[in-house]
Amino acid sequence: MPRGQKSKLRAREKRRKAREETQGLKVAHATAAEKEECPSSSPVLGDTPTSSPAAGIPQKPQGAPPTTTAAAAVSCTESDEGAKCQGEENASFSQATTSTESSVKDPVAWEAGMLMHFILRKYKMREPIMKADMLKVVDEKYKDHFTEILNGASRRLELVFGLDLKEDNPSGHTYTLVSKLNLTNDGNLSNDWDFPRNGLLMPLLGVIFLKGNSATEEEIWKFMNVLGAYDGEEHLIYGEPRKFITQDLVQEKYLKYEQVPNSDPPRYQFLWGPRAYAETTKMKVLEFLAKMNGATPRDFPSHYEEALRDEEERAQVRSSVRARRRTTATTFRARSRAPFSRSSHPM
């Protein structure tokens, strides 16, 4: 194949992957909108961050809203079409700003944000989540819209924190928050409040997967900023974000945080940890991203193919393990049925 044609094919594949990343990370855009619609409940620790931010790590803008789309920011890090990328970012920011302004004017959306924070606080305090208490939070003028407001709060809880708001009984007077993730909790985390924090795991794993199975620290912080989580600033759910992603999730073996090989000055990247590989799969993460976008995994062709290969490799490993177990069990049964013989010794 002529060299020029190969270059065109490589460029086309690169653009296709960038489009997949953009589509896959719309979930970050949505979570950013949710964050901006409701009042902030994350107390700032002070003007001086508690930890020194690494070079190149995005910081919270002063007097401006946080970045409203991670999709453009992340995809642009790999694009060599700088001018086009900048235009896409500006267009995305303009659209997001318009969307945010509209949502702030929507009192039902505002009430849903207030209710979501109320439900999270109830859970954190280990207090029952009662319908009567939720009605007290909703402004008197909008009580007739309570069902719509509750549905909005439930969607936010699912999208941002991976939580499902379930009715405890048919009467619908009490509710419980249940994790939608398959990730387990073996007791190493400090308490049950950690499972909503783990709702960030699927989006984080998704970012890493879409970025080629490793994401730079800068890329991860762009994503965190979209969620309203900033380096050195306490967050209602995640606590101190740097500690959460570089220590807590690393110690739990969900993430690996390591220096980029041969980087000088040193730069760092995030990868899936062994526990993430054990408790979820690339296909499940892709299904999560697709669901958040109203799409299917097949809408991400290259990543779908990679996820399929991962599923096949896992199936082969499981098959090999089962075969070894069958062989071991057969050998054990054969030995147990063999007659016991005792050597005879002359007197």
Curated annotation (Swiss-Prot):
GO BP term, example: negative regulation of transcription by RNA polymerase II
Q: Which gene encodes it?
A: MAGEB1
Question: Where does this protein have compositionally biased stretches of type Basic residues?
Answer: 1-17
Region: Disordered, residue numbers: 1-104, 315-347
Under PROSITE patterns, the record lists: MAGE
Composition bias, kind Polar residues: at what positions?
39-53, 89-102
Keyword set for this entry?
Tumor antigen
| Residue ranges constituting the MAGE domain according to the UniProt record | 108-307
The protein's matches in Pfam families, at most eight in alphabetical order, are given as:
MAGE (PF01454), MAGE_N (PF12440)
Cellular component, GO annotation: nucleus
Q: Kindly provide the name given to this protein in its UniProt entry.
A: Melanoma-associated antigen B1
Which organism is this entry from? Homo sapiens (Human)
Q: In which tissues is it expressed?
A: Expressed only in testis.
Low complexity bias: start-end ranges = 328-347
Q: Which InterPro entries match?
A: MAGE, MAGE_N, MAGE_WH1, MAGE_WH2, MHD_dom
